[in-house]
Amino acid sequence: MTSTDGIYIEGKRIDTGDCSGPRSARNVLLHPDVDAAVFETARGGVLREGLGFDLCDVAVITNIGIGDHLGLNFITTVDELAVVKRVIVENVAPEGSAVLNAADPVVVAMAQHCPGQIIFFARDRMNPVLATHRAQGKRVVHVERDAIVCGEGRKKHRFPLANIPLTRNGAIGFQVENAMAAIATGWALGISWEVIERALAGFVNDAQTAPGRFNVFDYQGATLIADYGHNPDAIQALVDGIANMPARRRSVVISGAGDRRDDDIRQQTEILGDAFDDVILYQDACQRGRADGEVIALLRDGLANARRTRQIDAITGEFLAIDTALARLQPGDLCLILIDQVEEALAHIAARIAEAR
């Protein structure tokens, strides 16, 4: 498997850093022990070198939303970004499938470019795209009461959300969508329901298994969540998910990627300002072309009309910002830490938790 965290083979990491490009994919395919591969396929690598493979059995597009990385590499609109992202859909084998989010119109439009079959997924079973696909007897995945349901014609299979720890009994909406996409992928590959069920039940998104992906910790009776979310869509998904988690007081630690557009940086704190009591801003280790303090100023601008936030602090340094947030926590509080240096920040958090025991 390749990802922005590295290359993993048989559960062991053989390379670190951003390995979501075609060179890493080719390295995996050339490995003598590999029979099947999963590739995170990033925009940048596709633009530079294309794909690291000819055809894929399954292509998965979870969402495009309002877009990310716009303004870079001459990609300025969501539609232009979609043209890049859909390359994996265009290169599905004729007997393969594309797993597409029926709730994202830009993703839905990719279906016409797929040489294989389409499996649509969406939380809302009444989604028009999903309903039409289901009425045609084609494969769909959706949520029905307390379960994820796979449907094809009159056939159905249910996966109780209570048996999928990733979703916290269905409370974390974006994790439900991730689980649906994973289930649809397994279904497309012909993997048995039993194997899919065991995989879902056994997967825990902790700092070791999925670093920086909604990692939850207990800190002296308060809840910490560490996540690498760094665009408005990700921030909104996190806010929606955390809304279902009880908390006495809510705080957030955030920086911004300097290579994003000004509006994209501002919009992140516009969202957070309506959901958190305290906001701690910090400057990324790498400013990505911005002057010192420029990103912090944009983040402050986004909080100008905050409906909930009452305390705003700007801290120099990610770890000092984390320590500042931890020092303020009381039992029953919740703190979202939007990390930049993923491995280092998670190690720092783990050390602080160990010290507090």
Model regions and ranges:
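A structural preference for short, hydrophobic beta-strand core positions in alpha/beta folds
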Residues: M1, F120, I312-T316
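Short beta-strand segments
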Residues: S3, E40, V60-T62, N101, ...
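Short, ordered loop/turn segments at secondary-structure junctions
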Residues: T4-D5, I64, R123, D284-C286, ...
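Flexible active-site lid/hinge loop adjacent to a nucleotide/diphosphate
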Residues: I9-F120, R125-V129, N163-T167, P232, ...
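Adenine nucleotide phosphate-binding catalytic loops in nucleotide-utilizing enzymes
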Residues: F74-A82, R86, G96, P115-Q236
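ATP-dependent carboxylate-amine ligase
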Residues: N169-I172, A184-E194, R198-R357
